[in-house]
C-alpha cells in the first residue's frame, strides 16, 4: 500500500443513486431559494440585512462548535448527527442536498473523510463559504482524518468558523468573536483541564487502541500508543489486518503491557471485539471512544470531557 493511500476509507457512497437524487432536486431547490430571497427594496420596504447565517456541517462534531459560536445569529444543521451512523460509508439524502444548496457556510472535515460533501457542493451550485477543516489545519488527503481529537486543530477551527460567519454577517462580527472567546476560554475549560491533568500525571504510559481515531488524542495527552500503526490503518480502511499485528497486540494484552485499551465503538470489527474481550479478561480497562457526539444531543465539550474523564479514571485504576 502506498503512503498516500494509507488512511483512505473502505467504502465509497454509491454515485449513481446520488446523482439521480441531486438531478431531481436542483430545480426545486433553486425555485425554493428564489421564494426565500429577501425583498428587493422599494417604497415602504426595509433594506435586507442577513442576521442569521445558515450553516451546514458535514459532521455534528463541527456543527456543535459552530452552533455555540454562532448563537442567535446562526442556524446550524449537521448532516451526520447520529452515533449509529458510520461516517465512512454515509450516502447523502434529498434533505441533505436541499440544506446544502441553501447554506451560506458549509463545513466539511476533509482529508477524505466526507467525500460526499464535495459532490453535494458541486451539485448545489451558487456561492457560499466552504470551510474544509483538513485544508485549514494542513492535513493533506491521505492523512489521519479524525481532526476533532486534536485540541490544537479544534482551536484553529473555532477561529476559522467565527471569521467565516462574520464574513457573511459583518454587522455581527463582534458578536461572533465574543462567543468564540467564550467558547475557547469558558466552554472548553473543563476539557482543557482534564487534558492537562492526564498529561501531567500519566504522560508516557502505554495504551492500546482499536483504530486511528485515538492517534491525535494520545499525542495531545502524551500517552504512548503502542498498537502497531499498520493495525490502526487496516481497521480504519476496513482491510485485513496482518497476523503479525494480531500476535503483537495479543501479547501486549496478555502481558498487561498496556494500561488502557481505547475502543472506537463506531468501528468495532471482529478482531477489535476479540481484543476488547481479552483486555477485559486481563483486567485492562476498556474506554469507549466515538467519531460523533454521544449522546447525539451532547455538546462537543460535554462529549469529549466525558470520554477524557473516563480515560483518566481508567488510568488511575491501573495505577492505584
Residue ranges and their predicted role:
Residues 23, 34-320:
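Extracytoplasmic metal-acquisition and chelation regions
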Residues 13, 19-33:
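Bacterial N-terminal signal peptides
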Residues 1-15:
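N-terminal secretory signal peptides that target proteins for export/translocation
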Residues 15-16, 46:
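Short, low-complexity intrinsically disordered segments enriched in A/P/G/S/L with frequent Arg
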Amino acid at each position: 500500500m502506498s503512503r498516500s493511500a494509507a488512511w483512505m476509507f473502505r467504502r465509497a457512497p454509491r454515485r449513481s443513486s446520488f446523482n439521480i437524487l441531486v438531478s431531481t432536486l436542483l430545480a426545486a431547490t433553486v425555485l425554493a431559494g428564489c421564494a426565500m430571497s429577501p425583498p428587493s427594496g422599494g417604497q415602504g420596504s426595509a433594506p435586507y440585512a442577513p442576521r442569521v447565517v445558515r450553516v451546514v456541517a458535514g459532521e455534528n462534531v463541527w456543527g456543535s462548535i459552530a452552533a455555540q459560536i454562532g448563537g442567535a445569529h446562526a442556524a446550524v444543521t449537521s448532516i451526520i448527527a447520529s452515533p449509529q451512523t458510520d461516517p465512512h460509508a454515509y450516502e447523502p439524502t434529498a434533505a441533505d442536498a436541499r440544506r446544502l444548496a441553501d447554506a451560506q457556510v458549509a463545513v466539511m472535515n476533509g482529508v477524505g473523510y466526507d467525500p460526499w460533501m464535495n459532490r453535494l457542493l458541486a451539485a448545489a451550485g451558487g456561492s457560499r463559504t466552504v470551510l474544509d477543516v483538513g485544508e485549514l489545519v494542513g492535513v493533506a488527503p491521505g492523512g489521519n482524518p479524525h481532526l476533532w481529537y486534536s485540541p490544537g486543530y479544534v482551536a484553529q477551527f473555532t477561529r476559522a468558523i467565527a471569521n467565516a460567519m462574520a464574513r457573511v454577517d459583518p454587522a455581527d462580527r463582534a458578536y461572533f468573536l465574543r462567543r468564540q472567546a467564550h467558547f475557547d476560554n469558558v466552554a472548553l475549560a473543563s476539557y482543557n483541564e482534564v487534558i492537562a491533568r492526564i498529561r501531567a500525571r500519566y504522560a508516557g504510559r502505554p495504551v492500546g487502541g482499536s483504530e486511528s481515531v485515538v492517534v491525535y488524542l494520545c499525542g495531545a495527552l502524551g500517552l504512548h500508543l503502542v498498537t502497531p500503526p499498520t493495525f490502526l490503518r487496516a481497521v480504519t480502511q476496513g482491510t485485513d489486518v496482518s497476523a503479525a499485528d494480531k500476535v503483537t497486540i495479543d501479547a501486549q494484552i496478555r502481558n498487561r503491557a498496556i494500561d488502557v485499551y481505547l475502543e472506537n465503538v463506531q468501528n468495532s470489527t471482529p478482531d477489535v471485539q476479540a481484543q476488547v474481550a481479552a483486555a477485559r479478561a486481563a483486567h485492562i480497562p476498556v474506554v469507549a471512544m466515538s467519531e460523533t457526539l454521544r449522546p447525539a444531543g451532547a455538546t462537543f465539550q460535554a462529549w469529549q470531557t466525558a470520554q477524557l474523564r473516563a480515560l483518566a479514571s481508567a488510568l488511575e485504576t491501573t495505577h492505584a
